[in-house]
């Protein structure tokens, strides 16, 4: 993370020596939200918004969460309803369902967002092949609601079959 244009230029000059392509993003202060959808637009089996906690923080003003943080369990999920208003959660769900429909995503998807202190929602990315395990977002959701993980996976497969038969 660079904190000035000069610092960014210096960093870019160094990176250009090793990489032919670079992605530069503006850092947005806020909370990391993820919306996990399982199913299809006629019936979502799972439709849940989670927040990511890192070093006991929900709101980030300069931190960058890396893959290693997730792999080494330095992050935790919490239910969005424990920190965000119902209207913000419903807006995230609506944006996610609209994006899934627009992008023709089927069966499973995870959309990531940054939510500012003013409740502005910024779309970060769509993950059309999110990790499915009992320690991933889906596992957290199942544990929270005391759902049987195998039953949810069976519903996931049923959703795929129903879509295939419909298409």
Whereabouts are the PLM-identified features?
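Phosphate-binding site of ATP-dependent enzymes
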Residues: 3-87, 122
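ATP-dependent carboxylate activation and anion-phosphoryl transfer catalytic cores
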Residues: 85-167
């Amino acid at each position: 993370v660079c904190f000035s244009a000069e610092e960014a230029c210096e960093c870019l000059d160094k990176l250009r020596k090793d990489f032919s392509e670079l992605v530069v993003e503006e850092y947005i202060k806020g909370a990391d939200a993820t919306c996990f959808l399982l199913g299809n637009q006629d019936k979502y089996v799972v439709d849940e918004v989670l927040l990511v906690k890192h070093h006991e923080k929900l709101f980030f003003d300069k931190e960058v969460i890396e893959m290693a943080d997730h792999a080494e369990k330095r992050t935790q999920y919490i239910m969005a309803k424990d920190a965000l208003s119902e209207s913000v959660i419903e807006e995230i769900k609506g944006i996610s369902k609209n994006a899934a429909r627009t992008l023709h995503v089927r069966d499973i998807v995870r959309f990531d967002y940054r939510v500012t202190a003013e409740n502005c929602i910024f779309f970060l990315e769509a993950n059309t092949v999110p990790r499915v395990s009992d320690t991933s977002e889906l596992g957290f959701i199942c544990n929270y609601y005391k759902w049987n993980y195998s039953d949810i996976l069976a519903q996931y497969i049923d959703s795929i079959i129903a879509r295939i038969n419909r298409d």
